[in-house]
């Protein structure tokens, strides 16, 4: 009876230890493969030597993983080539700007030389006509003075005949237009009219024209100065006014 107990107890202990060994093997098997529980169970049921080929699978997976990490340096290579294109700076431009500066100095010298020549020539021409009036005898007549230079102004001209009264324009009468016009008349030594100049207008062209037509018909006697008739000029104001 005691032997049977020992045998049974020894068998139980062996079975218990066998189970422990199996469970430890199962724990190792579950740690090795990643995500394949069905395969690990079938391997444990057959035999232990099949656990060894599971290790190269891990090495293969470990070797395959770093291969996926390698493409990162490729991005760094892409950044470098388009970064610094040297197209914008053009060095020949400042050279073209500096060249014309000395060219401007050259014509300035050539221009400066002919200037005194022109001045000398003009001075010579100006000096040449100077002796001509000295050579000619002074023969100024009263008539020539009235044409070339401004004659003297006479306040009270002498009329030969009665003045012709200017005509009052009909349009100005109907509209009630009034005004005063003044003309300057140039006369030669004989008293003949040379020039008529409007000094101040009446504000209406019709009145100014009517006064001018009347003045042109006036005749003046010569103005005598120191016993010599001279050219002169006079101012004639004409006033247009409606009565009543």
UniProtKB/Swiss-Prot annotation:
Residues 133-146 have a biased composition (Polar residues). The keyword Nucleus does not apply. One of its GO terms (molecular function) is energy transducer activity. Keywords: Cell inner membrane, Cell membrane, Membrane, Protein transport, Signal-anchor, Transmembrane, Transmembrane helix, Transport. Gene3D superfamilies: 3.30.1150.10. It is a single-pass membrane protein. It comes from the Bacteria. GO terms for cellular component: outer membrane-bounded periplasmic space; plasma membrane protein complex. Residues 1-6 are cytoplasmic. Residues 153-244 form the TonB C-terminal domain. It is found in: Cell inner membrane. Residues 51-146 are annotated as: Disordered. Residues 24-244 are periplasmic. One of its GO terms (biological process) is siderophore transport. InterPro entries: TonB, TonB-dependent_transducer, TonB/TolA_C, TonB_C. Pfam families: TonB_C (PF03544). The chain crosses the membrane at residues 7-23. Belongs to the TonB family. NCBIfam families: tonB_Cterm. Interacts with outer membrane receptor proteins that carry out high-affinity binding and energy dependent uptake into the periplasmic space of specific substrates. It could act to transduce energy from the cytoplasmic membrane to specific energy-requiring processes in the outer membrane, resulting in the release into the periplasm of ligands bound by these outer membrane proteins. Homodimer. Forms a complex with the accessory proteins ExbB and ExbD. This is Protein TonB. It comes from Vibrio cholerae serotype O1 (strain ATCC 39315 / El Tor Inaba N16961).
